[in-house]
């Protein structure tokens, strides 16, 4: 074992410090690094961020048209728009399609005592983000009433809001049941703050993206204002002043279609060209939506252009596997695409998803190379981490000394180190759809977090860094190129990469189990060893592992198990075993629709303890996502509990059983 550890540590030191990447020849590294342009990507961000890119909208269509034009100009194959019905009736697995929502006009004015407009509060034409998504048409004048958060009955005590507009600190959707449905308010003005980070509410001029429930029978409108505007209103209301507002919204909801731009670089190997590596992003989000997620969309467009240009000029050979690029709406568009195109899904070997990859220093962004779910281990994440470590080392050296083989900088960009973090699976974007056990596609997720301007009026192009865009695109492009070309001849180098990172993960596991009771520590250890063996087995998704490599793999994990120790066997008591309903694909919570709530009931869902559980390394939504992933027709409920405890921290068997019983009740599992 000492010899194994020594060889792995030596290999790791080489890959981090040398000016090359395993599995990517030096000429390929140079070609991609020199061609890929963060400045080009930033120009694309500027173009996309002009549009208010709501799903199934005129703004989204305009952004899609730009992508199609650029793909055609870059010379990609199979360039087209995939159109899938979005009418509020059609289902794509667990996603109820959401219809088109378009706005022709929306303004909010303060009205003087003489009935004339005295001050414009919001204008859709000037800033579309000021109108909450899915707002209904209205043309009315009403007094403004401060209703606090707007989500508690106590917020309305002693206040008459019937026929009036409420000023609230919560998202409009959360306010509707009480303010509009119960107490009769006719509209909402919200100053919901930016998402909670260390910089929460620090900038009082931010305007947050607002939402209303697409499918609610209670139709209303919501305007979004800054904290400064809200405080100014509140100061006047506290003195007893009456504030009259005129709200006018001209919007429509209609049957439409999810538009998904796609194009390919066709594989050249007759034996492998049917297989696909997919690059994805999500094209929707409000104007400006620069980092979220015009940045990811621009980055994969730049990767497509880079590959195509390098192949055309002979600096790269065509890939062995086909490389596909897709630009759907977040979550719902991706799920619709995967459900509607099983002919494509069956050929996808891996996906690389980019969501927020350009945040400069002002955004406070930290770049993450994020793994897929622990329930579905894959070596592709080790490949991405290896490339991320290479870029970290190169950019740190450049920042500290002014010299590096591959600084990966842009003239107009920053010179700071990338500082990428390598982290386990987190939820929050389309990667969780690819990886969901309905599809089981291994995924690499590249993303920024935190971002102080996410979902606000300040998510603008000026806060992005062209150097950051170049580096994040390079990590993705290098990962994708390796995956598009690896064969059994690369098994040795891949195994060395997996081996080194397996040891690092084992060290992390040993630290984490120290504070656990013996039973949970043993559970953590058993799952870890299963995870590492399964990760090595994932090589076979791409090729048959050669005998000279496979004979090393299992002895290594036997020795690793002996080194780790503390894995006492657990007798598996008789327990329920569930399997997925193959006719229903997707997770329970998607975009604008919750399958569990819709079918199990709101009150009954709220009583599910697993959804509220807070573990050492995850919370309710993560536990629920992985619980469904772990259902495979073989694991017992107790074994699923053990796996969840190992991934996120101890949880009771009763809580897991209750959740699985709820899924069985609505025929998600059987």
In which residue ranges do the predicted regions lie?
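Extracellular/luminal Protease-associated
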Residues: 46, 56-58, 119-221, 288, ...
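Catalytic-core environment of secreted peptidases
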Residues: 21-25, 37-60, 70-78, 95, ...
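Soluble metallo-hydrolase cores and metallopeptidase-like ectodomains found primarily
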Residues: 124-155, 209-292, 302-305, 309-318
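Second-shell loop/turn segments in exported
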Residues: 28-35, 49-58, 95-96, 131, ...
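Charged, amphipathic alpha-helical linkers/stalks
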Residues: 465-538
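Metal-dependent peptidase/peptidase-like ectodomains
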Residues: 122, 220-225, 230-231, 328-453, ...
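Long, charge-rich, low-complexity alpha-helical segments
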Residues: 619-670
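Noncatalytic luminal/extracellular "stalk/propeptide" segments of secretory-pathway proteins
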Residues: 19-24, 34, 38, 46-162
């Amino acid at each position: 074992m000492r010899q194994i550890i020594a060889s792995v540590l030596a290999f790791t030191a080489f890959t981090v410090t040398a000016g090359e990447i395993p599995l990517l020849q030096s000429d390929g590294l140079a070609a991609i690094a020199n061609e890929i342009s963060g400045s080009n990507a930033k120009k694309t961000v500027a173009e996309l961020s002009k549009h208010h890119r709501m799903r199934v909208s005129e703004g989204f269509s305009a952004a899609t048209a730009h992508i199609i034009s650029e793909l055609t100009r870059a010379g990609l194959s199979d360039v087209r728009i995939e159109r899938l019905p979005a009418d509020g009736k059609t289902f794509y697995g667990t996603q109820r399609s959401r219809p088109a929502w378009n706005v022709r006009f929306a303004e909010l004015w303060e009205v003087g005592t003489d009935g004339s407009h005295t001050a414009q509060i919001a204008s859709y034409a000037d800033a579309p983000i000021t109108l909450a998504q899915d707002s209904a048409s209205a043309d009315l004048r009403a007094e403004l009433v401060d209703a606090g958060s707007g989500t508690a009955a106590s917020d309305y005590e002693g206040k008459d809001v019937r026929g009036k507009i409420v000023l609230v600190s919560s998202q409009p959707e959360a306010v509707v049941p009480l303010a509009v449905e119960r107490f009769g308010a006719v509209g909402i003005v919200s100053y919901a703050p930016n998402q909670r980070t260390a910089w929460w509410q620090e900038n009082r001029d931010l305007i947050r993206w607002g939402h209303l429930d697409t499918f609610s029978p209670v139709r209303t409108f919501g305007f979004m204002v800054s904290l400064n505007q809200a405080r100014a209103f509140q100061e006047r209301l506290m003195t007893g002043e009456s504030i009259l507002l005129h709200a006018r919204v001209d919007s429509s909801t209609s049957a439409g279609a999810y538009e998904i731009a796609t194009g390919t670089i066709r594989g050249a190997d007759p034996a492998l060209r049917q297989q696909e590596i997919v690059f994805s992003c999500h094209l929707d989000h409000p104007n400006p939506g620069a980092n979220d997620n015009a940045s990811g969309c621009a980055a994969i467009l730049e990767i497509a252009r880079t590959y195509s240009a390098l192949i055309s000029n002979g600096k790269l050979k065509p890939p062995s596997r086909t490389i596909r690029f897709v630009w759907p709406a977040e979550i719902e568009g991706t799920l619709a695409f995967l459900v509607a195109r099983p002919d494509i899904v069956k050929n996808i070997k891996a996906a690389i998803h980019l969501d927020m990859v350009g945040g400069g220093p002002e955004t406070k962004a930290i770049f993450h190379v994020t793994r897929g779910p622990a329930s579905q281990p894959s070596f592709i994440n080790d490949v991405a981490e290896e490339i991320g470590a290479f870029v970290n080392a190169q950019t740190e050296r450049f920042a500290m000394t002014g010299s590096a083989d591959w600084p990966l900088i842009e003239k107009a960009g920053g010179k700071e180190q990338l500082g990428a973090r390598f982290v386990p699976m987190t939820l929050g974007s389309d990667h969780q759809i690819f990886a969901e056990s309905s599809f089981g596609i291994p995924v690499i997720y590249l993303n920024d977090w935190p971002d102080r301007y996410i979902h606000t009026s300040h998510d603008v192009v000026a806060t992005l860094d062209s150097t950051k865009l170049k580096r994040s695109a390079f990590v993705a492009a290098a990962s994708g190129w390796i995956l598009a070309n690896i064969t059994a001849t690369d098994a040795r180098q891949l195994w060395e990469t997996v081996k080194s990172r397996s040891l690092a993960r084992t060290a992390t596991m040993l630290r984490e189990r120290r504070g656990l009771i013996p039973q949970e520590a043993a559970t953590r250890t058993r799952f870890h060893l299963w995870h590492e063996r399964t990760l090595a087995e994932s090589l076979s998704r791409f090729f048959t592992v050669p005998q000279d490599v496979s004979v090393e793999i299992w002895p290594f994990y036997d020795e690793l198990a002996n080194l780790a120790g503390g894995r006492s066997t657990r007798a598996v008591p008789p327990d329920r075993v569930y399997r997925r309903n193959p006719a229903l694909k997707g997770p329970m919570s998607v975009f604008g629709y919750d399958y569990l709530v819709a079918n199990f009931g709101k009150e009954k869902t709220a009583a599910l303890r697993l959804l509220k559980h807070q573990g050492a390394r995850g919370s309710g939504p993560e536990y629920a996502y992985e619980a469904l992933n772990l259902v495979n027709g073989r694991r017992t409920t107790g074994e699923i509990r053990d796996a969840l405890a190992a991934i996120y921290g101890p949880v009771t068997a009763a809580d897991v059983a209750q959740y699985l019983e709820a899924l069985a009740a609505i025929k998600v599992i059987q």
